[in-house]
Amino acid sequence: MKRVMLPLIMLLLSVQTFAQNSIEEQVKTLSNQKWQWMADKNVDSLNLLFDDKSMFVHMGGSWGKTQELNVIKGGGIHYKKAEVYSIIINIIGNTAILLNDIDLIAVVGGNEVINPFMVTEVYVNENGQWKMGSLTFSKLSRPVKIK
C-alpha cells in the first residue's frame, strides 16, 4: 500500500506544481502585455483587461477604470516604457498578486520623468478570464537603474 501511495502523492504534487507554474506564466505574460498596451495607449485592450470596479493608485491620486482609461487616452500620463527588473507572483485561489520592481519612463504634464516603483497588480480570474482589479504605484527610495 505504501508503495502505491507515495508515487501517487508525488504525481499529484507535481501536477499541482505544473498547474501553478502555468498560471504564473499566464499572469506574467498578461502583465507584460499590459505594460505594452499602456505604452501604446491601447485603451481598447486595456478596457477589456480592467474590471469595471478596478482601482488605480498613483503618486497624484487614485481613481477608477474610466478615469484611468481617459488619462491614458488623453495623454495625462503616457507610460512610455516600464523596465521590469523582477516580478514576484503569488496565487491565492482565483486571485493573482504581482509585485513588480520597475523603472518607469513616463510623460506627465508634458515632462518626461523616470521613477523607480514597486507596482502591485491584482488580477482576479472569473469564468476563466483574468481581469485587473487594482494597480498601485509605490515610489521606491532606490536610485533609478535604467540607463
PLM regions and their residue ranges:
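A beta-strand edge to alpha-helix "cap/lid" segment located at domain peripheries
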Residues: 7, 20-48, 53-147
